[in-house]
Swiss-Prot record:
The lineage of its organism: Bacteria, Bacillati, Cyanobacteriota, Cyanophyceae, Synechococcales. Residues 1-24 are annotated as: Disordered. GO terms for biological process: translation. It comes from Prochlorococcus marinus (strain NATL2A). This is Large ribosomal subunit protein bL27. HAMAP family: Ribosomal_bL27 (MF_00539).
């Protein structure tokens, strides 16, 4: 027979680490080539001009320039697209 009360078990007590998703460079910001613009799961924001997409759907800058977001119509829903505009020296 038990001389101490047994402790109950629980199925809780775990949590995953945060993945630090989201926008890393906002509209109008200057970025360099290779810098991360958005970390995302899936393609909620589409890559535009001078923007590449990694295998985990991360968007990154292909050239130096400034960040610009635009809203586009894709099928029946509106989507966002991110572009990098490079300023040409005159």
């Amino acid at each position: 027979m038990a001389h101490k009360k047994g402790t109950g078990s629980t199925r809780n007590g775990r949590d995953s680490n945060s993945k630090r998703l989201g926008v890393k460079a906002y509209g109008g910001e200057k970025v360099t080539a290779g810098s991360i613009l958005i970390r995302q799961r899936g393609t909620s924001v589409l890559p535009g001009i001078n923007v590449g997409r990694g295998k985990d759907d991360t968007l990154f800058a292909l050239t130096d320039g400034s960040v610009h977001f635009e809203s586009i119509r894709r099928g029946l829903r509106n989507r966002k697209r991110i572009n990098i505009s490079t300023a040409k020296a005159v």
